[in-house]
């Protein structure tokens, strides 16, 4: 039988102040890999498919409560909330959680909201170990080369846990033990409920310790065992910004490795950052300095980077995106983007289309094979198929109060430095001359031009800027011209 065959509940402790973060944001709301710390913990808990998940919140609960609700919506399952009004220790926090688990009988796993690397696989292994042999408590432990600062796991000859001894209370013999407490436990619900009622705060901190449940259970003749995690890095807690960065780097390392094993080439893993929700296809090439964030989807045979940041983007098969910042938009098959392109939300570039250097788009739909090659702003616009927008063109969409839409047809050719004063429509097959300001609709197949004829005022520089280098150059050129004439 596996963990999924047994009744379980998961309690996630997230009530602490997290003062070492030195932040106005509650500790578990800091993010790595595109998720908050508590989101990582809740996703791991949900991976067990337990009957109940309870999040215990307290400090900063006005921030944490809505965040938990959002994660519950993403998971499409209920996450119960327990409030710890005063942070009176881990035992007290679990007491608060038990109010939400009234009548539950089964296994209760207690984990923390600041262990973002902990996986559902490890929690499942803990649950399996707990139910394999009837046990009151199973401690998830880890072995460390340097266990300094951690509570040591003391076992008897049968391998049962007899004590968890904190560093300050440990003898030299016990300090030599490399197996330590991770702070994650599996409990028999009935035994936990009974032991919690017996907790005392007669300790240096004046708090109720969850670890005291182990002694109470053993005192009543119940077995306490341990399950050792295969990867201690999963159980690293985050208490300050340094540990946040370390956890983020380790999570990213794992995510990048998974992408490479899935068929992507990542040229420089050290400078490539990929959020956990990102999807990457096969035969993808990712160049240095690339960040793939949010729910970005990278199709097969896409090339990304270098120096590219994509957030909630969909890049379809065969496209190329170089030195680009893009948000909440879609790039079609075999399209090309960049370099130095800024794609704002609501952009759709069709298959085989192009957004070139120093192009910015926003709420723009650009059809199959259409190109915006250089130095252009396209906002609130629709461009048909196989059209070409000349360099340095601007879609003038804002009148100071409202945004307006521009529609460009298919097979349109516009000259450089064309201004489209929205709302305006350019029909299929139309052209515009360089420097044209289009204020009125252009019929299909028409050539739009604007502005008066060029007028040259002879001698203006010598008259208005006498003695300047420009005036001297002009006079010299005129003398040469007169001599040749």
Swiss-Prot record:
Keyword list, A-Z? Acyltransferase, Cell shape, Cell wall biogenesis/degradation, Cytoplasm, Magnesium, Metal-binding, Multifunctional enzyme, Nucleotidyltransferase, Peptidoglycan synthesis, Repeat, Transferase
Checking Gene3D superfamilies in the record gives: Hexapeptide repeat proteins (2.160.10.10), Spore Coat Polysaccharide Biosynthesis Protein SpsA, Chain A (3.90.550.10)
Query: Where do the segments described as Linker lie?
Result: 242-262
Pfam families, per database record = Hexapep (PF00132), NTP_transferase (PF00483)
The biological processes this protein is annotated with in GO are: cell morphogenesis; cell wall organization; lipid A biosynthetic process; peptidoglycan biosynthetic process; regulation of cell shape; UDP-N-acetylglucosamine biosynthetic process
Residues of the region (Pyrophosphorylase) are 1-241
> What is one GO cellular-component annotation here?
cytoplasm
Cofactors needed by this protein, per the record, are:
Mg(2+)
Q: List positions binding Mg(2+).
A: 114, 239
Task: Give the enzyme class.
Answer: transferase
**Reaction catalysed?**
alpha-D-glucosamine 1-phosphate + acetyl-CoA = N-acetyl-alpha-D-glucosamine 1-phosphate + CoA + H(+); N-acetyl-alpha-D-glucosamine 1-phosphate + UTP + H(+) = UDP-N-acetyl-alpha-D-glucosamine + diphosphate
Q: What does this protein do?
A: Catalyzes the last two sequential reactions in the de novo biosynthetic pathway for UDP-N-acetylglucosamine (UDP-GlcNAc). The C-terminal domain catalyzes the transfer of acetyl group from acetyl coenzyme A to glucosamine-1-phosphate (GlcN-1-P) to produce N-acetylglucosamine-1-phosphate (GlcNAc-1-P), which is converted into UDP-GlcNAc by the transfer of uridine 5-monophosphate (from uridine 5-triphosphate), a reaction catalyzed by the N-terminal domain.
Write the protein's name.
Bifunctional protein GlmU
Question: Whose protein is this, by species?
Answer: Corynebacterium glutamicum (strain R)
Which gene specifies this protein's sequence?
Answer: glmU
